Amino acid sequence: MKKYLHILPACFLFYAAAHAQQKDTVYVTDFGAVPYSYENCVTQIQAAIDECKRTGAKVLSLPEGRYDIWPEGATRKEYYISNTSTEQECPSKVKTVGLMLHEIDDLTIEGNGATLMYHGKMTTIALEHCNGVRINNLHIDFERPAGSEIQYRKVTGGETEVTLHRDTRYEIVNGKIRLYGEGWRSNKNHCIEYDPDTESFTYSQGWNTLSASDAREIAPGIVRFNTPAEFMPKAGNTLTVRDIIRDQVGFFILESKNITLSRLQMHYMHGLGIVSQYTENITMDRVKCAPRPDSGRLLAASADMMHFSGCKGKVIIDSCYFAGAQDDPVNVHGTNLRALEKIDAQTLKLRFMHGQSYGFNAYFKGDTVAFIRAATMERFASATVRDVRRISDRIVEVRFDRDIPTSLELNHDCVENMTCTPEVEIRNSYFTRTSTRGTLVTTPRKVVIENNTYYKTGMSAILIEADAEGWYESGPVKDVLIKGNTFIDCAYNGGPGHAVIAIHPSNKIIDAERPVHQNIRIEDNTFRTFDYPVLYAKSTAGLLFRNNTIVRTETFPAASGNPYVFYLNGCKKAVIEGTVFKGETPRQSIKTENMKRKDLKTTIK
């Protein structure tokens, strides 16, 4: 008996030691990562991550400082990522991942304000099949961002002088300017011009003109071009130029669960931004997507900043800040695949249709799907997935638990994954300096967009689509609340109807008795706008626009030529009431098409 009594304390101590080890904090500096060394730390930080996985440590800590990460030694892995590149644009889907978290649970990465400074073209961090990962207080930037910035310095007929940002690398070869970076050259460029006087981001042909003109360097960072006499850009404006090929993404979260990014600052993202793909429960808390204040840069993302594709559970975006995107700051959607062939009574061959979205897992066993009529965007039947078989990067075979609807039209109708659709909350956030929309959201589950500011988004501040013939992204929405937001001078670049809020499904058959969207409420918002309409709504039932204030500004010239404040097309049971106009009172307030008078109730005369 005494022998066993001696063994018990030893067992307890072993258990306690093992349990304590699981709770230990792992420090990247213990693995050789040295802040401010300006040396490649990628293998050292990855070793610390791997140690957390091996031991079950709960915290990975980066002491404050700068840590440099190069492609050499980084993980290379093939990922098919939604909305990125076609087979022709980027034949290889292998990504260079700076830091890889694979099958890691319940880990907090504490950044302590540290900066990860990346080099070359890289996907900064990837989370694959993780659960309960939280990343706190970390800055991510690139030594040479893939976006270049060129400011017009002097402009005269026939000559244009520019200043290139200190982070923009260039060379002049045979009298023509070229942009390059660390291990890359910019070939197929897209250009957006920023006007500091109007704070607008507009599409520009300026780079096309400069790159075709003879150039000579007159001082480091200053280049003079012999440009056509009619080329007269505005001195002080800045061109933001980036390659259109989305060969990497800013940050990738794949098929994971319960992920939180908190006080993360993404100062530049190449390709596409933070992409969350088929992930459940994501919280973006005080995430800032914008250049470092001391960088002098305008651009923070080559395209979208937060992109959610096929996610489920809840997507929460709270107290975030977005400035400097060449596409949409927030985009939430699914992916519809087209029905190509009926293999048997319960099996369909489906195809990814859009060029830039294919190859990923779009359906999982047990998922509920809806069959979508492409012409009307109607969900006309449902089923449960029994099996999925990948045929190629573009083609999958899906077997269902019941017979395929006889009314399904092959090579036209689509299949939507209803399980992989999230609830969405976007609150207390700020959107600015983008040439496109502020928020795109399409999900059948509850959406709340509340207490945000949309400041001079180039197109509609909020766009709700639904399509099975363009991007093939999701079907109808059922429950959307847009409340307490402030919209300031949005849609100067256009969009559906040039509207501040646009509800624009892709259905070709417009019938108020067969609406696409339903139950969209727009309440207690303030619209400061230079143009109309404030709202464009197509094929929506149960549309409510109530107790909103509209203030007319003169920030930009009116561009739409539309005198109507509201433009409703094929809507049913629409209510517009309690609208307060300040400044100019419009002479014509509401335009309707493809709907009956009884389908609109309004207090506006």
Curated annotation (Swiss-Prot):
Gene3D superfamilies: Single-stranded right-handed beta-helix, Pectin lyase-like. GO terms for molecular function: alpha-galactosidase activity. It catalyses: Hydrolysis of terminal, non-reducing branched (1->3)-alpha-D-galactosidic residues, producing free D-galactose; Hydrolysis of terminal, non-reducing alpha-D-galactose residues in alpha-D-galactosides, including galactose oligosaccharides, galactomannans and galactolipids. The keyword Zinc does not apply. Its EC number is 3.2.1.n1, 3.2.1.22. Keywords: Glycosidase, Hydrolase, Repeat, Signal. Pfam families: Beta-barrel_GLAA-B_I, Beta-barrel_GLAA-B_II, Beta_helix. PbH1 repeats lie at residues 256-278, 312-334, 421-443, 444-466, 477-507, 517-547. Residues 1-20 form the signal peptide. Belongs to the glycosyl hydrolase 110 family. A subfamily. Alpha-galactosidase that specifically removes branched alpha-1,3-linked galactose residues present in blood group B antigens. Has no activity toward linear alpha-1,3-linked galactose residues. This is Alpha-1,3-galactosidase A. The gene is glaA.
